[in-house]
Amino acid sequence: MTEFKPIKEGKVREIYDNGDSLIMVATDRISAFDYILKNKITNKGKVLTQMSKFWFDYTRDVVPNHLISVDNKDMPEYFQQPEFEGKCTMCSKLTMLPIECIVRGYITGSGWASYQENGTACGIKLPEGLKESQKLPEPIYTPSTKAELGDHDENITFEQSITVLEKLFPGKGEEYATKLRDNTIALYKKCAEYALSRGIIIADTKFEFGLDEEGNVILGDEMLTPDSSRFWPLEGYEAGHGQPSFDKQFVRNWLKANPDSDFNLPQDIIDKTIAKYEEAYEMLTGKKL
């Protein structure tokens, strides 16, 4: 059996070269505040992989994506070992673009903190009188740079994203930046509408895109998982305060309340976290893992 070594290790994912494709493994690691926590969340990698597959299939008519297969039998023999079960994505090779494409449909988190200070979210002027967790009149696109492991992502304007891409792809910066923005908004609108019908509010999310060999913009990485998105229950939603969530915010809140934890979660928080991830998956897809 050929053994594989990762060519790249992120906070949560490991990437392996499979010749004309890549194998992306979603581990059970969890990160918060740009740090990898000491604990693993059992089954988390499976939730991320299967939820991304659901959304990639659902949005293929909007934007092409990198998904080839998540079926275990399609993987090289090495990835058919039990530890990889349900966590592997075979995907197309892309030249990834160094922009985190963030879209916000509701005012919360860092956007809410910024709005309280100066009436903007990531430099975008918003209407006066908004309450915390309120739905925005239209989703806003707030890109950021992609940080290396251990560094923090940095918010940038749309114009700055053009500059970043123009340096890498002379003559193509504005075209690529515009596609990233328009694709991000289109994907969010389609998926947020569907999620509402399943009882979940997608408050915000992030996408990552790359280029194929022909220079086409292709959706990559993960899609609308509890790691990359804020999911709130529609039932009981009311603007004016923070919302309960099905996502990593639960872990972030515990860490904020326990600053001396040294990024070490107690077992009950681990159990509640995976229960929330699995509940979100079942509500959105109508399937059990």
Label for each model-derived stretch:
Residues 93, 194-195, 199, 209-211:
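Short, conserved, surface-exposed binding loops centered on an aromatic residue
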Residues 171-203:
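A long amphipathic alpha-helix within ATP-dependent nucleotide-binding catalytic cores
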Residues 21, 96-98, 198-202, 214-217:
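Coil-to-beta-strand transition motifs
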Residues 103, 202-223:
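Conserved metal-phosphate-binding beta-hairpin within the catalytic cores
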Residues 117-118, 123-175, 219, 223-284:
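Anionic ligand-binding catalytic core segments
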Residues 33, 112-113, 214, 228-230:
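Intrinsically disordered, low-complexity acidic/polar segments
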Residues 1-148, 261-289:
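Active-site loop/lid in soluble adenylation, ligation, and acyl-transfer enzymes
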